[in-house]
UniProtKB/Swiss-Prot annotation:
Matches recorded under PANTHER family: TYPE III PANTOTHENATE KINASE (PTHR34265:SF1)
Family: Belongs to the type III pantothenate kinase family.
Protein name: Type III pantothenate kinase
Domain of life: Bacteria
Chain's role: Catalyzes the phosphorylation of pantothenate (Pan), the first step in CoA biosynthesis.
Catalytic residues, chain numbering: 90
Cofactor binding, note field: A monovalent cation. Ammonium or potassium.
Catalytic activity, as annotated: (R)-pantothenate + ATP = (R)-4'-phosphopantothenate + ADP + H(+)
GO CC terms of this entry: cytoplasm
Primary subcellular site in the record, as a coarse category: cytoplasm
Gene name in the database record: coaX
């Protein structure tokens, strides 16, 4: 067990497939963990069992089951106007975090189990969004729900647009199909909000970011793996001074 510092605290988001932990010292994020189901036996609570914790769960595991001392955040805790009652708490927290760090208007592209786009307008109000199957989910669904199609991992480089085998045809659909969907939605966002910023986050962020590089100017978007943590931080201490987190820092924490 690590002796805690007095200003240390946890942020915790329990997702559909992973647990996301962050260790803060005051307002500074010092370490993160993104745990798969196989890794849950070694969660950070073993080393820091008595720290305060603020968090939320959108998965099947309740927050208190993972960390009994945790303060559970709800949608009602997020002062974001125009949210609908069934908006995913993870989406709301990520959007709230993006607003604190990057300002408005903003579109959060979360490339997780689902691929979601969540918007805030220039009045810092929730302005709608989109829910699509995640790119990994699309790949698995083709293999799981058809008799003859194989599982094809996400392409690591642009494939041929017109596949000449089953595998290359699926790879093309995953790559160019997802790119076309994102381009259509993000073009519409930037047409409506010319000063808007796009922030990419989530487990498949590297793949989605590669797609955005093919059609979106670099000054219109950035990457940030910690939007939910910024949102939790802002709810824990609304008066805290928020520092910027440029995209080159996203892999600083492990």
């Amino acid at each position: 067990m690590v002796p805690p510092e007095t200003n240390q605290w946890f942020a915790l988001m329990i997702g559909n497939t992973r647990q996301h932990w962050a260790l803060f010292r005051g307002e500074h994020l010092s370490r993160t963990w993104h745990l798969t189901p196989e890794e849950l036996a070694c969660n950070p609570a073993q080393d820091y069992p008595n720290l305060p914790c603020w968090g939320a769960s959108v998965g099947s595991v309740p927050l208190h089951q993972v960390y009994p001392r945790a303060i559970a955040l709800t949608l009602e805790d997020i002062p974001l106007p125009q949210m609908y009652p069934t908006l995913g708490l993870d989406r709301a927290l990520a959007l709230w975090g993006a607003l604190q760090v990057y300002g408005a208007p903003v579109c959060v592209v979360d490339a997780g189990t689902a691929l979601t786009l969540t918007l805030a307008n220039d009045r810092r109000e929730f302005a709608g969004g989109v829910i699509l199957p995640g790119v990994g989910l699309m790949a698995r669904a083709l293999a799981d729900y058809t008799a003859a199609l194989p599982y094809v991992p996400l392409p690591t480089e642009p494939p041929r647009r017109w596949g000449t085998t089953t595998t290359t045809a699926i790879a093309s659909g995953l790559y160019y199909g997802t790119a076309a969907i994102l381009q259509a939605y993000l073009d519409a966002f930037l047409q409506e909000f010319p000063q808007g910023t796009v922030i990419v986050t989530g487990g498949d962020r590297p793949f989605v970011s590669e797609l955005l590089r093919t059609f979106l100017d670099s000054d219109r978007w950035c990457e940030d793996d910690h939007l939910v943590f910024w949102g939790i931080r802002a709810l824990r201490n609304p008066a805290a001074k928020i520092e910027m987190h440029p995209m080159e820092r996203i892999d600083e924490f492990h």
